[in-house]
């Protein structure tokens, strides 16, 4: 629960200091790139997460490795995380920043769960329908889950719209079991 509160507080602060949509996008890309680098270089992650390593050493490592690669705001943000002993939450902060940035940019992220991969045409129809309904730009990520048998499940903004065959079969089963003969 602490991680959620910390990640929300710091990611919100980073979104709030952005002065325009381009800066929000730039910060998002920089955070995603940085976390990606941490994931691909375990030794670097280990060093930066090491509680025995001094703050000054960690900041020096970041400065040497990323001063030409990261925006000054992001580098300073990472320094603050190190100073406040919050760097261990960087992955959660990146996830929360991603969510807040998309929301601030008016982009609705949707996960479309289907039993088989959906071609571009049906996916585009869903995207257009959602765009008209929510008056927002829509980004769809298709996730294949054979367990749902058929139909689809839409997951967006903490809402789930389940129109899967699996759910319909479960409803049918309940109604058959509770039916009075």
UniProtKB/Swiss-Prot annotation:
Organism superkingdom = Bacteria
Q: What InterPro entries does this protein's entry cite?
A: ATP_synth_OSCP/delta_N_sf, ATPase_OSCP/dsu
What cellular-component terms does GO give this entry?
plasma membrane; proton-transporting ATP synthase complex
List the subcellular locations.
Answer: Cell inner membrane
Swiss-Prot/TrEMBL keywords: ATP synthesis, Cell inner membrane, Cell membrane, CF(1), Hydrogen ion transport, Ion transport, Membrane, Transport
Q: Where are the transmembrane segments?
A: none
Topology of the protein relative to the lipid bilayer: Peripheral membrane protein
Gene Ontology MF, one: proton-transporting ATP synthase activity, rotational mechanism
Q: How does it assemble?
A: F-type ATPases have 2 components, F(1) - the catalytic core - and F(0) - the membrane proton channel. F(1) has five subunits: alpha(3), beta(3), gamma(1), delta(1), epsilon(1). F(0) has three main subunits: a(1), b(2) and c(10-14). The alpha and beta chains form an alternating ring which encloses part of the gamma chain. F(1) is attached to F(0) by a central stalk formed by the gamma and epsilon chains, while a peripheral stalk is formed by the delta and b chains.
Q: Which family does it belong to?
A: Belongs to the ATPase delta chain family.
Name the NCBIfam families for this protein: ATP_synt_delta
Q: Which HAMAP family match?
A: ATP_synth_delta_bact
Role this protein plays: F(1)F(0) ATP synthase produces ATP from ADP in the presence of a proton or sodium gradient. F-type ATPases consist of two structural domains, F(1) containing the extramembraneous catalytic core and F(0) containing the membrane proton channel, linked together by a central stalk and a peripheral stalk. During catalysis, ATP synthesis in the catalytic domain of F(1) is coupled via a rotary mechanism of the central stalk subunits to proton translocation.
What's the protein here called? ATP synthase subunit delta
């Amino acid at each position: 629960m602490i991680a959620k509160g910390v990640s929300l507080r710091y990611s919100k602060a980073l979104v709030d200091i952005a002065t325009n949509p381009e800066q929000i996008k730039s910060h998002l890309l920089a955070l995603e790139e940085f976390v990606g680098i941490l994931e691909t270089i375990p030794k670097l992650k280990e060093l930066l997460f090491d509680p025995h390593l001094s703050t000054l050493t960690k900041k020096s490592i970041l400065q040497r490795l990323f001063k030409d690669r990261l925006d000054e705001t992001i580098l300073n943000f990472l320094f603050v995380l190190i100073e406040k002993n919050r760097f261990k939450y960087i992955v959660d902060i990146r996830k929360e920043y991603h969510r807040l940035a998309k929301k601030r940019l008016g982009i609705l992220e949707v996960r479309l769960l289907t039993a088989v991969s959906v071609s571009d045409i049906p996916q585009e129809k869903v995207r257009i329908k959602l765009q008209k309904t929510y008056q927002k730009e829509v980004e769809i990520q298709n996730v294949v889950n054979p367990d749902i048998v058929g139909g689809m499940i839409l997951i967006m903004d903490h809402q789930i719209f389940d129109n899967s065959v699996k759910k319909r079969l479960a409803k049918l089963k309940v109604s058959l079991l509770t039916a009075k003969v």
